[in-house]
Amino acid sequence: DHIPPEKNLVWKAAKLLQERCHITDGIDIYLEKNIPAAAGLAGGSSDCAAALIGINELCGLGLTLGQLCDLGVTLGADVPFCLQKGTMLSEGIGEILTRLPDLSPLWVLLIKPDISVSTGYVYTHLKLDEITSHPDTEHLIDCIRRHDDATLARGLSNVLETVTIPEYPILAELKRFLSDNGAIGSLMSGSGPTTYGLYQDES
C-alpha cells in the first residue's frame, strides 16, 4: 500500500518485458501481497518472479528460464532464485545458482516483529572488512547431502545480522527464544527483521 506503482517490482517486471519484447497489448495485474514488505522474506522478489513467469506465458513470449533469470537479476538480486525451485547455492550477487539436493523436511516457525527494515540501508551499512566469521559453505553443502539437519542448522549464519541486530536488539531475543523452545537452529531471514526457527517435528 505504501509503494508507488512505478517502484513496485511487479510493475518494473511488466515494463521491462514490454520494452524488451515489444508487447503492445495491455495487461491488468492484481497483486495481493501475503508476504509483508521490508520483512527480509524476498516478498518483492517473489512477486517479481511470478510476474515475469506469468507475462511470459500470457503473452506467449517464449523466453527460457535462463533468459528470465538474466532479466530478473537486473530488477533484484533474489529474483533468479525465486524463478527457480528447490535448494540452491547462490553466489555473486545472486545470479550464479547451483542446484543442490533437496533439504530434509523441516518445520519452520517465522516471527515477524512490528518492524520494517530497509534492505538498502542494511547493505549500505554492512562493513565487510569487519566480518570475521563466515559460514563454511562446503561443510553446509555436505550436511545437506547427508541430511544432517542438526549440524546444518547449527552451522547457519547471516552476516547481515551484524547490521540489523544492533539496531533492533529484540531480534537477538527472538533467536534465543526460538532456540530455548526446541529449535535446532534460529536465524534472521535476509536483512531482517523476520526471524525463524528450524524444527525437526511439529510439536
Residue ranges with predicted function:
Residues 60-101:
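Glycine/threonine-rich beta-strand-loop-alpha-helix active-site module
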Residues 84, 89-185, 200-202:
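Conserved, helical-rich catalytic subdomain that frames metal- and/or nucleotide-binding sites
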Residues 43-44, 188-193:
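Glycine-rich beta-strand-to-loop/alpha-helix junction loops that act as flexible
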Residues 196-198:
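Short hydrophobic/aromatic beta-strand micro-patches
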Residues 27-40, 182-186:
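Short pre-catalytic strand/loop immediately N-terminal to key active-site residues, enriched for Gly-Thr
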Residues 19-28, 54-74, 201-203:
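Phosphate-handling active-site elements
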Residues 10, 39-65, 81:
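DPxDG-like acidic metal-binding loop motif
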